[in-house]
Amino acid sequence: MYTLKKSLGQHFLKDEGVCRQIISVLQERPVERLLEVGPGGGALTKYLIEWPSIEFLAVELDEEKVEYLQKTYPSLQGKIIHQSILEIEPPFVGSFTVVGNFPYNISTQILFHLLEWRSQVECAVGMFQKEVAERVAAPSGNKVYGVISVLIQTFFTVEYLFDVHEQSFNPPPKVK
């Protein structure tokens, strides 16, 4: 199996219903190339690798998780970038979609990184700490509307999709 690393902000999604909701949102639009950020134990990955006709890559910093994923899902051989999302260049030529249960401790940094890739990122579906998601999706004039709201909303259409209970994660995060 694998161990969870608090230093990497690891809280793995374990609720299959939430996984299916995320997959359903992704399936609402055509996807040709897909980057999964922080696949961890593969809760979303197991669904994503079954999609026909997509070019799939994952980026995972934790070597133990990379080894686990490659052993559990042999089709991932050569499809996992073993680095931090914050340190890589766009992994595809052309446009792509991003999905992930983003580590809460670097989720704002990930959003700024995706802004750098804005000409290529068609869509991003991510799990964020509730406070971050509310700030990103806040309308002008809202008390939490700020720099991140302005920047992301300038280049992307933002939609707050649904809340996820902390018990849907292992271990449950201390924040929503």
PLM-predicted stretches and their roles:
Residues M1-K176:
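Catalytic cores of RNA-modifying enzymes
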